[in-house]
């Protein structure tokens, strides 16, 4: 929990690289679309809410990871369509947070 900023950025940076590989090598990941992921995203959101209500730190961490995967997955699909990528998502969020 005392990770440095560099360690945090490195950990986050691994995720898009792993997903890139999965989109090539894994048939399930390769066939996913925004629509096919949508119900899974809703399910993962409910699982996070349940973990939060139970104050279950182990499952909060797990479910946050699952949702983070979905965010990166949607951004990857957007990138493949030439619409946006994870940088655009992060920039949009940061621009919204800065007032």
Residue locations for each model-derived region?
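Flexible "arm" and connector segments at domain edges
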Residues: 1-64, 69-99
């Amino acid at each position: 929990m005392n990770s440095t900023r560099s360690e945090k950025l490195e950990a986050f940076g691994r995720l898009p690289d792993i997903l890139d590989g999965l989109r090539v090598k894994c048939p399930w990941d390769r066939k996913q679309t925004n629509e096919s992921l949508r119900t899974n995203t809703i399910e993962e959101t409910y699982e996070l809410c349940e973990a939060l209500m139970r104050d279950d730190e182990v499952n909060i961490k797990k479910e946050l990871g699952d949702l983070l995967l979905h965010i990166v997955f949607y951004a990857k699909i957007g990138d493949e369509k030439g619409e946006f990528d994870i940088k655009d998502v992060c920039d949009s969020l940061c621009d919204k947070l800065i007032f």
